[in-house]
Amino acid sequence: MTNSSNNYVILVDENDNPQGTMEKIEAHEKAKLHRAFSVFIYNSKNELMLQQRALSKYHTPGLWTNTCCSHQKIGESNIEAGKRRLQEEMGFTTDLQETISFIYKAPFENGLTEHEYDYILVGEYNDDPKPNPEEVNDWKWMKLEDIETDIKKNPSLYTEWFKIIFEKHKNEMVKSPI
């Protein structure tokens, strides 16, 4: 697989059947449904690790969101993709498990649209991450009830997909402490 494959997403139908590939920016410009994943890392206190997206990101720079998210590569499992991206963005890896999947659509002010068949992956980690500054501006641990309160008070500080996932699926996302 060439380096350019990093810039492609897997187009899917509403049942997650592959329909080909498309360059990532083009898929977001055309609001094409594509496969994605969102990683949620909890510590032993059941706090969620949030990241603030790097200010250089092409969409939603500087907004708070889940631990990491991205797109699977062709032939890559959801878990493999989640572990790869967790290492690339946050500088660590841990065991992950799939919880739920769903489709969402979120348009942005810059004309791009996230339209994703999103897999939610959860894991546990109790150390500080070593974030990649090209991907992550900041990070923090937060209790779910504090996230819920802050999203209501300051919705513009969070990514649209995180607000959608959190509101609709927060009860299914929680990983019981080990």
Language-model regions: role of each:
Residues 8, 58, 175-177:
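Intrinsically disordered, low-complexity, charged terminal extensions of DNA damage-control enzymes
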Residues 31, 45, 77, 87-128:
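Active-site segment of metal-dependent pyrophosphate-handling enzymes
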Residues 23-25, 62, 103-105, 112-178:
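Nudix hydrolase/Nudix homology domain
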Residues 9, 47-48, 139-140:
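A residue-level structural signature of the nucleotidyltransferase/glycosyltransferase Rossmann-like core
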Residues 2-38, 44:
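Acidic, metal-coordinating catalytic segment for phosphate/diphosphate chemistry
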Residues 25-37, 43, 47-84:
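Conserved Nudix-box catalytic region and its N-terminal flanking loop in Nudix hydrolases
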